[in-house]
């Protein structure tokens, strides 16, 4: 795969994939960006916005009318003003990156005619109203809230619509399946319709008490006869001399067992004897023979049900009602009345059951009014119903668009499931919908149709940022609506403006609450670029409106066939959240309805085309899909006749003829997530280990020197670019200026006359991430380099030449070593520590605030009482630590003093004060000190002052530096602008006839470059030429130049003004100082490391280089792993990676030899030939010139990087071939010598290069020791945990252990003086000071707590101070 990019030419990856990628992988953070853009619609023209997102929210809440309908507030449009601070300023100041929302509202006041009640418009007022700030998304798909980056995780929830299910036979002891249907709206009441054990159908609203479903139908306006005719067909039985004549229908009589002989009504012949079962085939044959009607006797009619009321036509008397069962008695009465024909319900108890008829019979409500009252009583128990209120309440439950919303998705799903065709704009329920649901449910009970699978991805959808935010903002607006209505009614509506009616606080508060405290708004995992990207692609089933951990069963957490290509089956957390938190697959995207789609190539008549189609899980159910690795001939036809496919309908893997295949996967890696796609040889790892591997890559700490893996998968570049860690060029151009903090590129394409022709890229230097890892970007380009749009120009944390680089390639030997790698321990060589291979920088942030207290303001100063000059050596005159100072635990970072309260003085003190004057100080030292366990260098200090507080020297110095930086940016941009503009102007004026010019220019002479050089550039604009077109062009250029210049100056002044303005600090805070300490962490025993295959371990020992096992050429292994960690874990991928890494390093050595040869003989031919052998016919390598070739060879010297994509990577033969090319043993094993004795080991050992990561579980963050520290207030026991500087818990089991050993005194000491015997603690201290080693244990404070607890229960407990068993004991009080 040729990568013709700037960095791609510097280091070429050999690609092992065989399958051509047809579809472009979508941008990896598209989910977040697209969703939020759709919500805000900033880019859309204000008038032409679609009814979705923010627009839809306003449209749904407005217009708002007052209670008397005399005025109305209408929504016109909204727009955003530019944000007050940009992203970086928000991060530094602890602000939220947000834009003010301006909404135009129109207030219409009506005149109401008292007689007719007609309204006429009296007055219209329009006004812009500020509606709070809406947080904006940064370029990388995050939000900056109160200065920290947060991510809004997408939520998976049950799609709105209708679902059919049964209880799996659990409810009733007989194991009978009870079917149920549930209509779930997007918002509004749930409607459940369910069977009970007696086959009566009930309805429940919002899980309240159940009602017979016929009551619901009565409330919908049907009567008994209509209900029966909706659910059952009618059959007319005609009276003849011989009996009853019934029309014969094969479908109806199939499966029917006869009790009497079946007789043809026309011929009188017996067609079927008694006791026989009528099969489907036999029934069809009878119909074909011309059987039209059967003869039935009276006893055949008994037990059937009437379809219509039987009325005496003369008197109007009702003999029997519709739905009544015919008994022998009632049949006799009917015969006496002389009815010639009866209309009965077609219920045969086999194919059609009498459930609705039985429900109707059991229902005590017979009219619409009764039914409405009943529903009202269920929904609002205790309130007396009136017909009006009951009607309104029922109407508002399902049919009012303000209260009930199915959403477009819900309507689409409902139409599909019930085979209806309502438009997706109709978002409330209809009568037809409810009847269709009941019909389908009864059909299920009769054995027709299938229940739904709620874990099918067609029944679960994704709510992304935009939608979550939309719901939240709607809640805020609805809260506001109530207030507006009340205000409209209470003020004089003729004199007010819209501004006076609106209080935007509730809307702003809803947004703030959502970003600050919602379960889905999470502190971004910023350990490395991969963890950022994964966090943004996460799908959570938890959160508001979702599941809870405790309630979620196995089914929800399981992998489902529809996850293929949509949700990764591998990446999910271990522990209680397993399966509830998932990750999007690499190629997946979310469609407009919120369903996850995956791309497929269309197959036409057995030929695979390059047309890519995205299918959701519902659509895929209709097709057969072939795998990406099916063999194709050069024309794209299938080689095999039978193809292995996934059949969407049965969800099974089947063999299908080639011409029946509909689609084919676009790529083998489309079924896994980004993190899993970064694991080479994933196909050779057990799934459990792959899960750990993909999770642990997210915990890899960025190292000081990033190094891309020798054995990659080809995804590394994609992740680095899309995560925003590496910087890509926005436009094609030439590098103009460069230093460590910024890159200036002069654009040569995409030039827009209204915009600057210069792109300035600011690099982040030693910034702290959310996880305290270090974010540092380094430029990759030199001045004069040509870069194309999209080329990587700077590396970020954990990236190397634009590729993700989470760890380092180290030389590994798989062998036991003195038990030091027992149980997954890891043995390391001292070289790793010495060469800083696994060294990382962590930046800790400490802040201190000077507040205004009741006793006076706190002060940040160098003048601290009772502190030696030695302790202040790192502070400047303002009392703040210098940048670059080395600090360790306990050092002062910022000196601060707090006024102390005056304590009442004793007469003696008063006398002394009178004699000796003022007391030394009434302030105490509250300085910010370095906490225990931290040691490092100060890299940055930020000082924030409240507006109106004088800035100290340090704050002014920081401000001056910042202004200089801004001025330099402005001057550089100005210089490039001048160069561009005057260069173009000189080109335009060159060799033109001059008719005017600056002072001293002779008229009608030629303007040449030499003439121009004589005048300052600012006077060039005075030259004039007779060519009008030329002059117009120059005039336009000048206008644009002046505008650009003015814009630059204005931007600079704005930024300076922001700097000099005071900061917005929390109330009561006068000044705040933030100090950043960079801590260098070398790897040490106790740190956790891991490979990419779930092979994790803890460093047990660091061994001197000379003691490590070494190879024949004297190279020492860097790391020794236990071979027993492989077989039982079944992650063989690490072994294949080791072999391939060994080959890569071997090839790198060979390239190194060709470099040496070039320096000796100046001949590049051997180098080109070696590279051709390795890479084959790679276009990139052919196109390189000599200088580029040498640079490439230098970069390949440590090892040749290769890409082996998941499920389509290097096979065993490829690995052997690579080893052969490198001149190494094809077994991948080498003779290894013991570093301590120099003897060779008996067996050959697998040696190679493996990519190891250092994980963010560092022993320095965990180790902790306490002597005396804080105690809990109530129990007086030490606190626990490192954060509280707590002690170690001596728990119940530890007490048992000491009891078992009979260590009575040790135990007593643990439970008293070392814990919560307050008096005893001080006595022990005094005894130790005296040099005495005896002590006496008193009563633990927790005993007193117990006594108090018992007293609170009303039990008076006293401790008597008697001599107990000869030991003195003090009274409790």
Swiss-Prot record:
Q: Which NCBIfam families match?
A: PRK00405.1, rpoB
Protein name stated in the entry: DNA-directed RNA polymerase subunit beta
Kind of enzyme, top EC level? transferase
* Known function: DNA-dependent RNA polymerase catalyzes the transcription of DNA into RNA using the four ribonucleoside triphosphates as substrates.
How it assembles, according to the record, is: The RNAP catalytic core consists of 2 alpha, 1 beta, 1 beta' and 1 omega subunit. When a sigma factor is associated with the core the holoenzyme is formed, which can initiate transcription.
What InterPro entries is this protein classified in? Answer: DNA-dir_RNA_pol_bsu_ext_1_sf, DNA-dir_RNA_pol_bsu_external_1, DNA-dir_RNA_pol_su2, DNA-dir_RNAP_su2_dom, DNA-dir_RNAP_su2_hyb_sf, RNA_pol_bsu_bac, RNA_pol_bsu_CS, RNA_pol_bsu_protrusion
A GO cellular component term found in this entry reads: DNA-directed RNA polymerase complex
Single GO biological process annotation from the record: DNA-templated transcription
What family is this protein classified in?
Answer: Belongs to the RNA polymerase beta chain family.
Listed under catalytic activity are: RNA(n) + a ribonucleoside 5'-triphosphate = RNA(n+1) + diphosphate
- Entry keyword set: DNA-directed RNA polymerase, Nucleotidyltransferase, Transcription, Transferase
| Family matches, as HAMAP family | RNApol_bact_RpoB
Query: So what EC number does this one have?
Result: 2.7.7.6
Q: Does the keyword Transferase apply?
A: yes
Entry GO MF terms: DNA binding; DNA-directed RNA polymerase activity; ribonucleoside binding
């Amino acid at each position: 795969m040729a990568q013709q990019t700037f960095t791609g030419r510097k280091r070429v990856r050999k690609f092992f994939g065989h399958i051509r990628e047809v579809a472009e992988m979508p941008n990896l953070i598209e989910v977040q960006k697209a969703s939020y853009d759709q919500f805000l619609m900033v880019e859309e023209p204000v008038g032409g916005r679609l009814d979705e997102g923010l627009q839809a929210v306003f449209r749904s809440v407005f217009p708002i009318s007052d209670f008397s309908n005399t005025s109305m507030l209408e929504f016109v449009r909204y727009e955003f003003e530019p944000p007050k601070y940009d992203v970086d300023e928000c991060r530094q100041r602890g602000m939220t990156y947000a834009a003010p929302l301006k909404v135009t509202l129109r207030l219409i006041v009506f005149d109401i005619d008292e007689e007719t009640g007609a309204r006429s418009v009296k007055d219209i007022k329009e006004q812009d109203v500020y509606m709070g700030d809406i947080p904006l998304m940064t370029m990388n798909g995050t939000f900056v809230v109160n200065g920290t980056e947060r991510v809004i995780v997408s939520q998976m929830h049950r799609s709105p619509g209708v679902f059919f299910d049964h209880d799996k036979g659990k409810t009733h002891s007989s194991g009978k399946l009870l079917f149920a249907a549930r209509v779930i709206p997007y918002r509004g009441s749930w409607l459940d319709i369910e069977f009970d054990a007696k086959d009566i159908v009930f309805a429940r609203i919002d899980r309240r008490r159940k009602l017979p479903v016929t009551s619901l139908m009565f409330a919908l306006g049907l009567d008994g006869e209509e209900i029966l005719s909706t659910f059952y067909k009618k059959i007319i039985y005609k009276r003849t001399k011989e009996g009853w004549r019934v029309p014969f229908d094969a479908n109806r009589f199939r499966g029917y067992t006869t009790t009497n002989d079946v007789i043809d009504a026309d011929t009188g012949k017996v067609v079927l004897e008694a006791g026989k079962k009528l099969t489907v085939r036999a029934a069809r044959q009878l119909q074909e023979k011309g059987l039209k009607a059967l003869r039935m006797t009276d006893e055949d009619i008994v037990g059937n049900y009437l379809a219509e009321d039987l009325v005496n036509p003369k008197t109007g008397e009702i003999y029997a009602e519709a739905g009544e069962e015919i008994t022998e008695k009632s049949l006799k009465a009917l015969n006496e009345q002389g009815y010639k024909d009866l209309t009965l319900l077609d219920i045969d108890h086999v194919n059609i059951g009498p459930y609705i008829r039985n429900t109707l019979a059991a229902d005590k409500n017979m009219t619409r009014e009764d039914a409405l009252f009943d529903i009202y009583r269920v929904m609002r128990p205790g309130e007396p119903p009136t017909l009006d209120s009951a009607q309104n309440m029922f109407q508002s439950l399902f049919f009012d668009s303000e209260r009930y919303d199915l959403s477009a998705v819900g309507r689409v799903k409902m139409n599909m499931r019930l085979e209806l065709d309502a438009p997706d704009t109709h978002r409330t329920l209809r009568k037809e919908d409810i009847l269709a649901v009941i019909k389908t449910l009864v059909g299920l009970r009769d054995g027709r149709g299938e229940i739904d699978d709620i874990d099918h991805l067609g029944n679960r959808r994704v709510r992304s940022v935009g939608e979550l935010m939309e719901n939240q903002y709607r809640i805020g607006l609805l809260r506001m609506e109530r207030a507006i209505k009340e205000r409209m009614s209470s003020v004089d509506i003729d004199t007010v403006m819209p501004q006076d009616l609106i209080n935007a606080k509730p809307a702003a508060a809803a947004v703030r609450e959502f970003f600050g405290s919602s379960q889905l708004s999470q502190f971004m995992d910023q350990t490395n670029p991969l963890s950022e990207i994964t966090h943004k692609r996460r799908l959570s089933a938890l959160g508001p409106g979702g599941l809870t951990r405790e309630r979620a069963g196995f089914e929800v957490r399981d992998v489902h066939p529809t996850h293929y290509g949509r949700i990764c089956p591998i990446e999910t957390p271990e522990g209680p959240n397993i399966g509830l938190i998932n990750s999007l697959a690499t190629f997946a995207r979310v469609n407009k309805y919120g369903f996850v789609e995956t791309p497929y190539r269309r197959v036409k008549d057995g030929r695979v085309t390059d047309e890519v189609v995205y299918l959701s899980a519902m659509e895929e159910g209709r097709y057969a899909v072939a795998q990406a690795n099916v063999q194709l001939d050069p024309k794209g036809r299938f080689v095999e006749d039978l193809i292995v496919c996934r059949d969407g309908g049965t969800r099974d893997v089947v063999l299908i003829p080639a011409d029946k295949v509909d689609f084919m996967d676009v790529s083998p890696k489309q079924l896994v997530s980004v993190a899993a796609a970064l694991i080479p040889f994933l196909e050779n790892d057990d799934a459990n280990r792959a899960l750990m591997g993909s999770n642990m890559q997210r915990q890899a700490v960025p190292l000081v020197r990033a190094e891309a893996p020798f054995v990659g998968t080809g995804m590394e570049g994609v992740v680095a670019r899309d995560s925003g860690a590496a910087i890509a060029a926005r436009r094609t151009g030439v590098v103009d200026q460069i230093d460590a903090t910024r890159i200036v590129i002069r654009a040569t394409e995409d030039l827009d006359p209204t915009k600057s022709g210069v792109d300035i890229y600011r690099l982040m230097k030693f910034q702290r991430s959310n996880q305290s890892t270090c974010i540092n970007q380094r430029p990759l380009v030199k001045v004069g380099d040509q870069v194309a749009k999209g080329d990587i120009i700077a590396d970020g944390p954990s990236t190397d030449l634009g590729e993700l680089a989470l760890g380092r390639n180290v030389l590994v030997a798989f062998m036991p070593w003195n038990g030091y790698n027992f149980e997954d321990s890891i043995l390391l060589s001292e070289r790793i520590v010495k060469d800083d291979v696994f060294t990382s920088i962590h930046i800790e942030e400490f802040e201190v605030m000077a507040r205004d207290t009741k006793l006076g303001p706190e002060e940040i100063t160098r003048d601290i009482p009772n502190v030696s000059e030695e302790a202040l050596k790192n502070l400047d005159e303002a009392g703040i630590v210098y940048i670059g100072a080395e600090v360790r635990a306990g050092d002062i970072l910022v000196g601060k003093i707090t006024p102390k309260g005056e304590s009442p003085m004793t007469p003696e003190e008063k006398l002394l004060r009178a004699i000796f004057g003022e007391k030394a100080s009434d302030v105490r030292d509250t300085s910010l000190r370095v906490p225990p366990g931290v040691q490092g260098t100060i890299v940055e200090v930020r000082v924030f002052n409240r507006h109106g507080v004088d800035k100290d020297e340090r704050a002014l110095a920081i401000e001056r530096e910042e202004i200089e930086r801004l001025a330099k940016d402005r001057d550089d941009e100005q210089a490039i602008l001048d160069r561009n503009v005057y260069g173009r102007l000189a080109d335009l004026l060159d060799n033109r006839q001059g008719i005017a010019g600056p002072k001293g220019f002779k008229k009608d002479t030629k303007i040449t470059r030499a003439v121009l050089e004589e005048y300052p550039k600012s006077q060039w604009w005075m030259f004039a030429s007779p060519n009008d077109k030329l002059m117009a062009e120059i005039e336009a250029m000048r206008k644009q130049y002046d505008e650009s210049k003015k814009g630059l100056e204005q931007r600079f002044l704005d930024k300076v003004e922001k700097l000099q303005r005071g900061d917005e600090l929390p109330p009561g805070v006068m000044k705040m100082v933030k100090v950043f300490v960079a801590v260098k962490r070398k790897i040490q025993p106790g740190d956790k490391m891991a490979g990419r295959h779930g092979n994790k371990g803890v460093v047990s020992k660091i061994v001197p280089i000379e003691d490590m096992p070494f190879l024949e050429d004297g190279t020492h292994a860097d790391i020794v792993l236990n071979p027993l960690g492989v077989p039982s874990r079944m992650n063989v991928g690490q072994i294949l990676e080791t072999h391939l890494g060994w080959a890569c390093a071997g090839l790198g050595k060979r390239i190194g030899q060709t470099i040496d040869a070039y320096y000796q003989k100046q001949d590049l031919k051997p180098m080109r030939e070696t590279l051709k052998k390795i890479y084959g016919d790679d276009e990139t390598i052919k196109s390189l010139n000599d200088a580029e070739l040498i640079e490439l060879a230098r970069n390949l010297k440590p090892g040749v990087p290769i890409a082996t994509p998941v499920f389509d990577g290097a096979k065993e033969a490829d690995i052997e071939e690579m080893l052969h090319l490198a001149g190494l043993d094809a077994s991948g094993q080498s003779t290894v010598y013991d570093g301590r004795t120099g003897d060779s080991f008996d067996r050959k050992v697998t040696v190679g290069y493996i990519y190891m990561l250092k994980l963010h579980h560092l022993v320095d963050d965990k180790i902790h020791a306490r002597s005396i520290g804080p105690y809990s207030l109530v129990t007086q026991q030490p606190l626990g945990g490192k954060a509280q500087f707590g002690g170690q818990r001596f728990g119940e089991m530890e007490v048992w252990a000491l009891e078992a050993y009979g260590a009575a005194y040790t135990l007593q000491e643990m439970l008293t003086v070392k814990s919560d015997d307050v008096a005893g603690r001080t006595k022990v201290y005094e005894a130790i000071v005296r040099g005495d080693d005896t002590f006496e244990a008193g009563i633990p404070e927790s005993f007193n707590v117990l006594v108090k607890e018992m007293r609170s229960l009303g039990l008076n407990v006293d401790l008597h101070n008697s001599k107990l068993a000869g030991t003195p004991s003090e009274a409790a009080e």
